């Protein structure tokens, strides 16, 4: 019995120590949670504390049930021990009373019994009965000593049990007081756990919403990356098209330079033909002067013919020769006049053709320059517009992303503040529950804490509303971005149509160029016939050509500088676009790293929770094994109690048998005393 009670006490002490240790661990975790929250690291420990408290509630209920059962068993055993103690006291009192009565009766009988020889055989019979009675008394005394020894052992055990009971009662009272405190604390913890469960559910909902928003933002970012890739491809295509257009413009400029060179050569040839015509005109004028001189000489000769008829005959031959020469000169003059007229006609035709060609060339130059300028202006404007729009969109998206990040950071800060305030409220509530509930200031503090809690819940609701607004805003941004992307696609299609139209115009220009080349070939054929005449004028024209080449080289340098500036501007724009793309890629990589960090932290939390679940399962298994051991020990204690009850019943039976024997012995003693009294009375009568 004592060993069982010691075992129960040790088991109870172990359970109390485990419970206190677990409670201290929970409080230490709670304090570490508060410190971590103050330092900004209180998410995992807070969830672990909530999980521990949620897991602690059924253990505490089972522990309370087990304590109630043990208290009931202790009360039952105490009742049985009290009853047994009363029965033993009654038995001891009756034994002492019977022993004293027997002792008194025997002493009285022995004193009253005379030692004479007159009795004879009766005395011998009485001696035999006395011997029997003495043997019975010895046996009764032995049983009495055994019963006294048992009574002493039982009394010692009862004293020890009484002491243990008192100690256990003190410990039980302390434990009851502690259990009441623990129940109050558990009730408070249960309320706090309920509140924390609600807050955790809300936090889980918010975390799920945040994860949804993060996934949606990641999807949006991937879509934007795809769109950026498409935009890069389109920009590359546009750059390739611009390069093609620049190549086409360079080809057109080269063709224009060739045409200008052809025009310059045609001008030189025309100038040479003009000079040749001037020379022919000067020769014709000289011939005319000669004709005038010859006419004057003829007049003089005619005047002299009258005077020199004699000499006419002599000079007829000379006159005939002169007439022949005159005829030849007239023929030559006529031929020269015809040549002059043909040259004038050719000159006029050439001038007309040159004017037409110059007009056509000027028109072509104007059209080509307009076309090139329009194309360059359009491409520049479209590239600038697309660049500006892309920059505006990128800046707007970056600003919106930064604003959303700031809002998320602010919301996270507000959530952390709410958690800190809630934990401060919980600390104050714990302090208030520890200090008691008697003062009005505590009630005021409770009301203030309740108001703070309501304010925190309102702020939480406001944060949820802001999150919904942010999600709606993100959806609006997605719709706006999709609309802008569709608009940019339409603009790109328009640009492609414009490029196709410009290609068609370039085809028309190439056809016109072919026509002009054919006309230039014809002009070359015509100028080849005039080259023979213009060989003399080429020497003079070389100087002018060199000057014109110098001028054209200067113009070419200017055009090259302009082209370089255009290329530099295009390169700068490409560098800027690459820089923007690099920044976007960096931002995307940063988002990827952040999402990876979040996923890793979530996985770490999940692993921690799994490890804690496994640890708690092991702890529950250990507690269940301990409970099974305790139940087994309780069953063993019940068996021992039953054995002790059987032993007590045996002792009661022995006591009842001893009482019966004492009663029979007292009856026999009373019979013997009666017989002795009768014998004494008879002896007295005989003496009388």
Curated annotation (Swiss-Prot):
InterPro entries: SCLT1 (IPR038911). It is found in: Cytoplasm, Cytoskeleton, Microtubule organizing center, Centrosome, Centriole. One of its GO terms (biological process) is clustering of voltage-gated sodium channels. The keyword tRNA processing does not apply. Residues 69-673 form a coiled coil. The modification Phosphoserine is found at residue 681. GO terms for molecular function: clathrin binding; sodium channel regulator activity. The modification N-acetylalanine is found at residue 2. Keywords: Acetylation, Coiled coil, Cytoplasm, Cytoskeleton, Phosphoprotein. It comes from the Eukaryota. GO terms for cellular component: centriole; centrosome; ciliary basal body; ciliary transition fiber; clathrin complex; cytosol; microtubule cytoskeleton. The keyword Transmembrane helix does not apply. Transmembrane segments: none annotated. Adapter protein that links SCN10A to clathrin. Regulates SCN10A channel activity, possibly by promoting channel internalization. Interacts with SCN10A and clathrin. Identified in a complex containing SCN10A, clathrin and SCLT1. PANTHER family: SODIUM CHANNEL AND CLATHRIN LINKER 1. This is Sodium channel and clathrin linker 1. It comes from Homo sapiens. The gene is SCLT1.
């Amino acid at each position: 019995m004592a060993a069982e009670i010691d075992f129960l006490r040790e088991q109870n002490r172990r359970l109390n120590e485990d419970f206190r240790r677990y409670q201290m661990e929970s409080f230490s975790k709670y304090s570490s949670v508060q410190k971590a929250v103050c330092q900004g690291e209180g998410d995992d420990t807070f969830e672990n504390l909530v999980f521990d408290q949620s897991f602690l509630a059924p253990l505490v209920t089972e522990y309370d049930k087990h304590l109630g059962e043990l208290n009931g068993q202790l009360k039952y055993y105490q009742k049985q021990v009290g009853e047994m103690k009363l029965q033993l006291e009654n038995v001891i009192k009756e034994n002492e009373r019977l022993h004293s009565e027997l002792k008194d009766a025997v002493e009285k009988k022995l004193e009253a019994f005379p030692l004479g020889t007159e009795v004879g055989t009766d005395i011998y019979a009485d001696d035999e009965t006395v011997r029997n009675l003495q043997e019975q008394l010895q046996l009764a005394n032995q049983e009495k000593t055994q019963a006294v020894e048992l009574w002493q052992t039982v009394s010692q055990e009862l004293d020890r049990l009484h002491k243990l009971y008192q100690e256990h009662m003190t410990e039980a009272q302390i434990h009851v007081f502690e259990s009441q405190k623990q129940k109050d604390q558990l009730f408070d913890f249960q309320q706090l756990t309920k509140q924390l469960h609600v807050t955790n559910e809300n936090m889980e909902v918010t975390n799920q919403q945040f994860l949804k928003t993060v996934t949606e933002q990641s999807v949006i970012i991937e879509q934007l990356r795809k769109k950026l890739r498409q935009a890069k491809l389109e920009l590359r295509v546009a750059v390739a098209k611009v390069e093609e257009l620049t190549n086409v413009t360079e080809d057109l400029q080269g063709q224009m330079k060739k045409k200008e060179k052809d025009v310059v050569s045609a001008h030189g040839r025309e100038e040479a033909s003009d000079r040749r015509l001037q020379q022919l005109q000067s020769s014709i004028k000289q011939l005319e002067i000669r004709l005038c001189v010859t006419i004057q000489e003829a007049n003089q000769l005619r005047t002299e013919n009258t005077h020199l008829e004699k000499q006419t005959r002599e000079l007829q031959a000379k006159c005939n020769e002169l007439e022949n020469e005159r005829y030849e000169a007239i023929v030559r003059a006529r031929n020269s006049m015809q040549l002059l007229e043909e040259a004038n006609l050719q000159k006029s035709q050439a001038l007309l053709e040159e004017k037409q060609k110059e007009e056509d060339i000027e028109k072509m130059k104007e059209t080509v320059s307009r076309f090139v300028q329009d194309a360059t202006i359009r491409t520049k404007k479209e590239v600038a517009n697309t660049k500006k729009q892309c920059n505006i969109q990128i800046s707007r998206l970056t600003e919106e992303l930064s604003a959303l990040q700031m809002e998320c950071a602010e919301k996270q800060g507000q959530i952390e503040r709410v958690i800190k305030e809630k934990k401060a409220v919980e600390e104050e509530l714990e302090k208030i529950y520890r200090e008691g509930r008697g003062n009005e200031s505590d009630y005021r503090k409770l009301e203030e804490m309740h108001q703070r809690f309501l304010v925190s819940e309102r702020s939480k609701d406001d944060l949820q509303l802001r999150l919904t607004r942010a999600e709606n805003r993100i959806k609006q941004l997605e719709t706006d971005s999709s609309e802008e992307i569709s608009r940019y696609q339409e603009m790109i299609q328009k640009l492609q149509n414009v490029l196709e139209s410009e290609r068609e115009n370039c085809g028309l220009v190439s056809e016109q160029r072919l026509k002009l080349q054919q006309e230039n070939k014809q002009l070359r054929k015509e100028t080849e016939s005039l080259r023979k005449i213009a060989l003399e004028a080429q020497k003079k024209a070389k100087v002018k050509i060199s000057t014109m080449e110098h001028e054209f080289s200067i113009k070419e340098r200017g055009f090259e500088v302009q082209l370089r500036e255009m290329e530099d501007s295009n390169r700068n724009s490409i560098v800027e676009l690459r820089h923007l793309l690099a920044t976007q890629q960096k931002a995307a990589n940063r988002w990827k790293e952040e999402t990876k960090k979040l996923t890793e932290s979530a996985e770490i939390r999940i692993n921690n929770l799994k490890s804690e679940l496994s640890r708690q399962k092991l702890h529950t298994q250990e507690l269940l094994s301990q409970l099974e051991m305790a139940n087994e020990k309780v069953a063993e204690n019940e068996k021992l109690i039953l054995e002790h009850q059987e032993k007590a019943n045996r002792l009661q039976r022995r006591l009842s048998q001893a009482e019966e024997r004492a009663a029979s012995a007292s009856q026999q003693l009373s019979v013997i005393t009666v017989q002795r009294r009768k014998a004494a009375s008879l002896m007295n009568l005989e003496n009388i």
